């Protein structure tokens, strides 16, 4: 067992449960599309974040150290994707029927986004550089951290989706839904600002 598994888990919980792009999109999707249609997003985050951790542990972190420009480019690509996503959320369909025909965020979009999500990339770099060392404990520690990331990711993203579904009960008319979508879009844009502070 990793000697610092408790602090690793606490860090993972704080990183996963606090507001950020993945959680805002889960909240929005749960609100607008329900639990079942948000499953691709849930699975994309649940598998994508641990896969990012694995890639970093296996050497991607060294590429970032030697070529920091690559990490900067990924941050800017992630920012552009979030702006696009905020636009999509803000101007989503005006009617309930159109919403039923729309597809929420797809699995592959969410999975790939984990490599562009500045909050997730930063959390992963901290986890890998602080708690995983090359040597005889590498496989054991990496496995434990990835399992923790899987559990924390699925729990947090599912909770945010259920919160979105719960808030749907208060949506009494289309105007409320439009304002909700504008608010989620604004929160997503606000989360971008925090990456540059």
Sequence positions of predicted segments:
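Residue-level signature of transmembrane alpha-helical cores of multipass secondary-active transporters
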Residues: 8-12, 45, 110-114, 149-153
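Membrane helix-loop-helix hairpins that form the core translocation module of multi-pass transporters
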Residues: 36-106, 163
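Hydrophobic/aromatic residues within the transmembrane alpha-helices of Major Facilitator Superfamily
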Residues: 13, 17, 50-51, 87, ...
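Juxtamembrane transmembrane-helix termini in multi-pass membrane transport proteins
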Residues: 2-69, 126-145
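Residues that mark transmembrane-helix kinks and helix-interface sites
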Residues: 21-24, 83, 122-125, 157-161
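Selective transmembrane alpha-helices of multi-pass membrane proteins
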Residues: 65-94, 150-156, 160-163, 168-197
